[in-house]
Amino acid sequence: MSEAREVWSAGTYERLAARFAPVQEQLVNLLGVSRGDRVLDLATGTGEVAVRAARNGGVVTGIDVAEPMLAKARERAAEEGADITFDLGDVEYLPYEDACFDVIVSNFGVIFAPDHANVAAELARVSCPGARLGFTAWKPNPRLGELYRGFTEDPIEGREVYEWGREDHVEDMLGEDFELEFEDGTLWLEADSAEEIWQLFSESAPPVIALLKQLDEARREELHRAFVQLYESYRTKDGGVRAPRRYLLVLGRRK
């Protein structure tokens, strides 16, 4: 867990998380979070989903591996006047009793835990009968993946991350314990320029920050140029940049 903690403690993740707002809203709305629901936000990050669930009256707990992110989540909750419990911990080994949550949610978070079987077992264990489950998972981005492969042999997000973007894998992991539904989605990343997107990712996306730390100055600049060139291909007629990122939305109900 120490390596993951180091990776996810870097950068200003809250800036990137702000771009996920439409998906965060979608998740909370589809899960029907309401007053009194006991909600667990897995890999809560800087707390965006947790705060939205609390606004709806949920009794919310968020857990994350990175204390710097949790500190920002606590600040955000305090600004909102939201009473949220934030715990430092590993989503593969949750420090909670059996069947103690009505809603389990994760927005592009729990998918980064490497042991999928452990994650699935823990989701089932802490969910009460009839509990609602909702999480989002990135689908492969072939062009971006090819770019990163020019700088590292290993996928920067981890080899297993995109498995969660496959319906058959989710069924294999969770189908025994949850009735599952799936919905494809696209998140549009918009900016005035490709350079603006580079600044966002190089300062706020922990896997990209970790990759940059592994490269010397010349290779970092090479990655910078390649990244900007890629996103320049998403120029719109009005001169801005609008790039799609596909994801899978998973909804479930505990059997």
Model segments located where?
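Conserved class I S-adenosyl-L-methionine
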Residues: 1-37, 48-52, 69-72, 132-156, ...
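Conserved Class I S-adenosyl-L-methionine
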Residues: 19-20, 46, 162-255
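A generic alpha-to-beta junction signature in SAM-dependent methyltransferases
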Residues: 31-33, 54, 127, 174
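Class I SAM-dependent methyltransferase SAM/SAH-binding core
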Residues: 38-93, 118
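A short acidic, Gly/Pro-enriched loop at the edge of an enzyme's catalytic core
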Residues: 92-103
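A short SAM/SAH-binding and catalytic strip from SAM-dependent methyltransferases
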Residues: 103-116
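A short glycine-rich, Lys/Arg-flanked "PGG" loop and its adjoining helix->strand segment in the class I
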Residues: 117-132
